């Protein structure tokens, strides 16, 4: 099965980027314990402080689904509730 990736753009309320970055950094540390989460990166656009991106890679689509229903993502959602204006993910198959 091909690896699976998700590229997420998170639009946040002005003035809350540091809070979102802190929450994402904690989430990144927690997902290291998810055996089929291969990579999780937080990206900061240079020219837009109302957006944060994440790049996520999983063993396969089933691993991504497990991540979506896992405790770390539930905690992240709680931590950033009310300050995320819009969230857009692009689900991808990784070409080897």
Where are these regions (language model features)?
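Glycine-rich beta-strand-turn "strand-cap" elements at beta-sheet edges
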Residues: 2, 9, 41-50, 75-96
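N-terminal first-folded block
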Residues: 3-34, 38-41
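Acidic/polar helix N-cap motif
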Residues: 13-16, 48, 60
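Intrinsically disordered, low-complexity acidic/polar segments
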Residues: 17-19, 51, 63
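Terminal low-complexity, poorly structured segments
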Residues: 20, 49, 69-72
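An amphipathic, aromatic/His-enriched active-site/gating alpha helix that lines ligand/cofactor pockets
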Residues: 26-39, 57-90
């Amino acid at each position: 099965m091909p690896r699976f990736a998700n590229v997420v753009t998170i639009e946040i309320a002005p003035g809350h980027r540091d809070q979102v970055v802190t929450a994402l950094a904690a989430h990144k540390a927690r997902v290291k314990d998810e055996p089929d989460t291969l990579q999780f990166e937080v990206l900061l656009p240079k020219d837009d402080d109302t957006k944060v991106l994440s790049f996520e890679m999983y063993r396969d689509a089933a691993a991504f689904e497990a991540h979506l229903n896992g405790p770390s993502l539930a905690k992240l959602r709680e931590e950033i509730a009310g300050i995320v204006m819009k969230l857009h993910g692009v689900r991808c198959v990784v070409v080897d």
